[in-house]
């Protein structure tokens, strides 16, 4: 990398990486269906016990080495350097993710346009059919929107850490927060608001089950962008005298806060119109919410535009973070200029994105192991590469890096019993928890 983050820039960049589409279409639904604040409490505990622990492990790899993921493992390993360097190649998972993630942000861009122009769909059946048509037969819309988002993401990364990634997050993350607060203020005037508050915050411990614990465990890991080199790469540009602990806790808090704000906004309108509160994922965003924004008339067009734009912001900040690890590796290892590195990565990402579109247009084409290209990339990244990357980081820091080096690194910020607890969790509990998540994902 060619520069360092500022302290606030680092926090906002990593928070931008963590805050993504799942904050709108998965987290709120899980909270509401799984015991409200009881689930939130469970999620916070597991985030501190798993996500926080492995986050600090990846941060320590990046900070001590000041290298990209591949070279970081190789530099810090006292022996078997080449073997450990392969652990850094889990950053390929980020390239797979950004290939289909950018396409999804493109869909959201299309819906932002429909909302601004007042052309969203008036009922659930029409909304469902039109969304199905978009992803199964509308190549032009998908191609144009995907290409626009692709260009924004790569242009941002081309400017480097300070002038690209940090600048984007320094204005986009506050803008996301302001949009959500404005939508929340309007939502508070609606009858559905108190129903949303009850749905999200009234604790119901009877709903906590083994399945919910596994869901919370998965969220605790995946919501912090672990396992694909992002944290290692960003930490290589961490400014001196940064308090790692408070920075990490701030990132976790921002991620949770955005998820809850999204939830209050989303479910206020869901309950206001009596829609199905059990939907999640694309069905929640592109069908239920798109319909109710249209039903609200002129104010709905404004709210819809604000909501979809906020999702675009959340998506772009995440996508940008996924490009940087591989770019940093190519620059370090092959002496490439940032421009050449991004051209190479761009060709890969753009090709995979187009294949995702073509695969969705023809369900019989581009099938691998019975999966569309989109589903295959999702499965490889989220069920295999990300968990594996997190496990390898925990094992490497817990058993390969000397404990004394970690005590020196964290000494000013985490001492005594707190360090020892973190170290025990890092070596034994957190990796086992991620293995459980990995196995449960395959058993679904």
Where are these regions (language model features)?
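Membrane-interface "cap" regions at the ends of multi-pass membrane proteins
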Residues: 1-25, 54-59, 63-76, 80-88, ...
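Membrane-embedded translocation segments of transport machinery
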Residues: 2-4, 166, 170-316, 340-341
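Hydrophobic, membrane-embedded alpha-helices of multi-pass small-molecule transporters
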Residues: 5, 12-22, 97-102, 137-159, ...
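Loop-to-transmembrane helix boundary motifs in multi-pass membrane proteins
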Residues: 9-10, 17, 143-144, 254-260, ...
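Inter-helical loop and helix-membrane interface segments of multi-pass membrane transporters/permeases
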Residues: 29-34, 69-89, 102-162, 194-214, ...
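Helix-loop-helix connectors at the membrane interface of multi-pass transporters/channels
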Residues: 105-137, 237-241, 246, 250-258, ...
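Hydrophobic alpha-helical segments of multi-pass membrane transport proteins
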Residues: 315-322, 341-360, 375-408
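A generic transmembrane alpha-helix motif of multi-pass inner-membrane proteins
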Residues: 372-397, 415-444
């Amino acid at each position: 990398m060619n520069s360092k983050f500022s302290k606030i820039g680092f926090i906002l960049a990593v928070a931008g990486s963590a805050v993504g589409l799942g904050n709108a279409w998965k987290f709120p639904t899980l909270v509401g269906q799984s015991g409200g604040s009881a689930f939130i409490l469970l999620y916070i505990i597991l985030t501190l016990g798993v996500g926080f622990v492995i986050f600090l492990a990846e941060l320590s790899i990046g900070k001590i080495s000041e290298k990209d993921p591949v070279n970081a493992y190789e530099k810090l390993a006292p022996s078997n350097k080449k073997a450990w360097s392969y652990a850094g190649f889990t950053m390929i998972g980020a390239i797979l993710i950004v290939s289909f993630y950018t396409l999804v942000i493109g869909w959201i861009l299309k819906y932002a346009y429909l909302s601004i122009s007042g052309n969203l769909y008036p009922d659930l059946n029409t909304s469902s059919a039109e969304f199905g048509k978009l992803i199964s037969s509308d190549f032009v819309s998908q191609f144009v929107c995907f290409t626009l988002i692709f260009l924004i993401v790569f242009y941002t990364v081309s400017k480097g850490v300070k002038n690209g990634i940090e600048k984007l997050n320094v204005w986009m993350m506050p803008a996301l927060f302001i949009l959500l607060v404005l939508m929340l203020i309007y939502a508070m005037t609606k009858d559905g608001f108190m129903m949303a508050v009850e749905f999200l915050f009234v604790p119901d411990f009877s709903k906590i089950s083994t399945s919910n614990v596994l869901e919370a465990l998965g969220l605790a890991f995946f919501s912090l962008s672990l396992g694909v080199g992002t944290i290692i790469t960003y930490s290589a540009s961490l400014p001196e005298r940064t308090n790692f602990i408070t920075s990490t806790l701030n990132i976790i808090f921002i991620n949770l806060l955005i998820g809850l704000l999204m939830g209050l906004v989303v479910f206020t309108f869901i309950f206001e119109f009596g829609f199905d509160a059990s939907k999640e994922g694309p069905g929640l965003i592109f069908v239920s919410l798109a319909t109710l924004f249209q039903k609200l008339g002129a104010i709905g067009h404004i709210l819809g535009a604000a909501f979809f734009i906020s999702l675009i912001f959340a998506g772009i900040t995440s996508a940008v973070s996924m490009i940087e690890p591989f770019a940093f590796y190519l620059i370090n290892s092959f002496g490439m200029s940032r421009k050449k590195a991004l051209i190479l990565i761009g060709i890969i990402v753009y090709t995979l994105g187009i294949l995702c579109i073509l695969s969705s247009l023809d369900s019989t084409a581009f099938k691998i192991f019975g999966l569309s290209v989109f589903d295959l990339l999702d499965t490889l990244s989220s069920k295999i590469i990300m968990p594996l990357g997190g496990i390898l980081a925990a094992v490497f820091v817990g058993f390969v890096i000397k404990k004394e080096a970690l005590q020196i690194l964290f000494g000013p910020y985490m001492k005594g019993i707190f360090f020892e607890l973190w170290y025990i969790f890092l070596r034994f509990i957190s990796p086992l928890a991620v293995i459980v998540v990995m196995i449960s994902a395959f058993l679904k």
